[in-house]
Amino acid sequence: MNKGNLIKNYAVALLNNAMVDNIQDKIFEEITSINRIITDNFDIREFLFSPIVNKNDKINAVNLLAKNIKISTIVQNFLLLLVKNSRTAILSNIVNAYNTLLYESKNIKIVQVISANKLQPKEQEWIKSRIEKELNQKTEILFDIDNTIIGGIVIKYDSMLQDYSIKGSLEKIKKALKTVNIAV
């Protein structure tokens, strides 16, 4: 099974378990929090991701972590399953896939907007309203900054990419100039 399908299968299983008790958002908050703790703490990350560390030690660590931060049984069992199957290294990917599935279940499209500088709240609202009008759907906008685009914005959703950046425009001009034969 390829990694993408594996990640999606884990995310779907977690979402289905959360739907039974109608706690999808709570589970997302918990799994995101756990992922942040693991990602931000080098020692915990190395311990859980290491193939050398005994699985029983990892299980004890997950149980201790669950007890200390009081997470649901669903998330605790899910983390234990990842440990038992040696899949803790893909937790971040599973969290992202879960997030996507959660928003899809609410008919909300996740859209990434990349700008060269931090956008003001009014600019963010304007962009959000334009995108929702274009897509005719509610959206969750993730605003990111990438100063290499020089100016403008890049919009990504599903497999679509709309490049309204200066860098993108310059690259299009460069490509067009390469295809033109100019006689001197």
Swiss-Prot record:
InterPro entries, A to Z: ATP_synth_OSCP/delta_N_sf, ATPase_OSCP/dsu
Pfam family, one: OSCP
Membrane-topology descriptor: Peripheral membrane protein
GO terms under cellular component: plasma membrane; proton-transporting ATP synthase complex
Subcellular location: Cell membrane
NCBIfam families xrefs: ATP_synt_delta
Subunit description: F-type ATPases have 2 components, F(1) - the catalytic core - and F(0) - the membrane proton channel. F(1) has five subunits: alpha(3), beta(3), gamma(1), delta(1), epsilon(1). F(0) has three main subunits: a(1), b(2) and c(10-14). The alpha and beta chains form an alternating ring which encloses part of the gamma chain. F(1) is attached to F(0) by a central stalk formed by the gamma and epsilon chains, while a peripheral stalk is formed by the delta and b chains.
Described function: F(1)F(0) ATP synthase produces ATP from ADP in the presence of a proton or sodium gradient. F-type ATPases consist of two structural domains, F(1) containing the extramembraneous catalytic core and F(0) containing the membrane proton channel, linked together by a central stalk and a peripheral stalk. During catalysis, ATP synthesis in the catalytic domain of F(1) is coupled via a rotary mechanism of the central stalk subunits to proton translocation. This protein is part of the stalk that links CF(0) to CF(1). It either transmits conformational changes from CF(0) to CF(1) or is implicated in proton conduction.
Family the entry assigns: Belongs to the ATPase delta chain family.
Name the UniProt record assigns to this protein: ATP synthase subunit delta
Record gene name: atpH
